[in-house]
Amino acid sequence: MSRIARRFEALRAAGRKALIPYVTAGDPNPDNTVPLMHAMVAAGADIIELGVPFSDPMADGPVIQQACERALRHHVSLRQVIGMVKTFREQDAETPVVLMGYLNPVEIMGYEAFAIAAASAGVDGLLTVDLPPEESHDLVQVLRSHGVDPIFLLAPTSHEARIKRICDAASGFVYYVSLKGVTGAATLDVDAVAEKLAAIRAHTDLPLGVGFGIRDADSAARVSRVADAVVVGSALVNRIAEHEQDPEAGRRVVSELLAEMRKAMD
């Protein structure tokens, strides 16, 4: 059983939902990332999503675009991000880590080379936001052969045939994007989310995570009532940006928000 599957099974047994924070690796500097990962786990994170900085993050809003820019000022590469996970694993062998980013850096590294390096460092999953499921077969096969879960996004606009295709390709969990548009966008309609999750559950037994639009403890709690996991990104990255000159303070305010969310979800 994979680390992600084990984590969801333990949460289910405890009657709890997963809290999944997203941060961009290398933001505001490379030395901050591993301590931030540990701080988030201490604050109640169940799975960590680690963004791989990319020069053209078209699915992301300005908050995460700027996080990528801050990380790329330090020339943070995919190999370095994998190295950060390896360092994190020296002290934490249990918390699943999913890399989230764009296909180009993985293609440049090569699917096989990436999967081998990621698996040996302790990466549990990969979410490539710009890889359509129709074109994902080769990467999915390579990831699975090395025990890395391919994770996919579903959107409010996803039709039934696409939902089925994605659920067939995915493992670990399925990530439902609760809003149209880019990350960091506006309001959240939990009833509409619940309706869409019911349609997705007809095609998979995988846990369903919901992200986009989760900003505070209240929205995290409301989404946790209908989803298996709550993903929070821009709200955390905003706080990191506000404390760019004092990363330790940034880690503290990120931890405070996650602890509030965890308490509200439980």
Curated annotation (Swiss-Prot):
Belongs to the TrpA family. The alpha subunit is responsible for the aldol cleavage of indoleglycerol phosphate to indole and glyceraldehyde 3-phosphate. Its EC number is 4.2.1.20. It comes from the Bacteria. One of its GO terms (molecular function) is tryptophan synthase activity. One of its GO terms (cellular component) is cytosol. It catalyses: (1S,2R)-1-C-(indol-3-yl)glycerol 3-phosphate + L-serine = D-glyceraldehyde 3-phosphate + L-tryptophan + H2O. The active site is at residues 49, 60. Pathway: Amino-acid biosynthesis; L-tryptophan biosynthesis; L-tryptophan from chorismate: step 5/5. Keywords: Amino-acid biosynthesis, Aromatic amino acid biosynthesis, Lyase, Tryptophan biosynthesis. It holds the Pfam family Trp_syntA. The keyword Protein biosynthesis does not apply. The keyword Transit peptide does not apply. It comes from Thioalkalivibrio sulfidiphilus (strain HL-EbGR7). This is Tryptophan synthase alpha chain. Tetramer of two alpha and two beta chains.
